[in-house]
Regions:
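N-terminal helical cap/lid subdomain that shapes the substrate entry/recognition surface
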Residues: 2-97
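A general structural motif
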Residues: 2, 110, 167-169
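Short alpha-helical
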Residues: 22, 101, 122-123
Length: 174
């Protein structure tokens, strides 16, 4: 019998790709409006390439972009990028349709809920709180907890331990 449902966070409960895309585009447009002469489409590809090589949660992506583009970090452009990125992220950080309703339905039926995410702990928890999902989960395991990414069994074994359940009593979505 299923006693718990384990979810991935990004691109399962929320549209991480859309949020990241819109936030990066906002940042690039803002730097351009601040006077940085860039081609938005090419610059977008460059920023996404930095994320792909450094990790999707890389905090210094615009520093690297500016160093590559103009040879140094201009704080005017950096500030424009960071503020616009945060605003774009916040505006596009949304749960998929029916996520809250589905989670509430599972909870009301006595099903435990958990998250296994490859995101760093702080970023995962910020998204969970921002979406007002923090009170719904019995266990959350992030990369910082397990030091290994899916599909490694380590994060799954850790969440099973936190839930006090066996692999035969859970289902993973994501």
């Amino acid at each position: 019998m299923i006693k718990a449902v384990i979810f991935d966070l990004d691109n399962t409960l929320l549209d991480f790709i859309k949020m990241k895309r819109e936030a990066v585009l906002n940042a690039l447009l803002s730097m351009n409006e601040a006077g940085l002469e860039i081609e938005i489409e090419d610059s977008y590809k460059q920023v996404m390439s930095i994320y792909e090589s450094e990790g999707w949660e890389h905090q210094l992506v615009f520093n690297k972009f500016l160093k590559d583009k103009i040879g140094y970090v201009d704080n005017k452009y950096l500030a424009a990028a960071i503020v616009a990125y945060r605003r774009g992220k916040e505006a596009n950080l949304k749960a998929y349709p029916n996520v809250h309703r589905t989670l509430n339905h599972l909870m009301k039926n006595g099903i435990k809920l958990a998250i296994v995410s490859d995101a760093p702990s702080r970023e995962a928890w910020m998204r969970i709180y921002y979406l007002n999902l923090h009170h719904m989960f019995d266990a959350v395991v992030t990369f910082d907890d397990s030091k290994e990414r899916k599909p490694s069994p380590k994060p799954f074994n850790l969440v099973l331990k936190k839930l006090g359940l066996s692999k035969d009593e859970v289902v993973m979505i994501g």
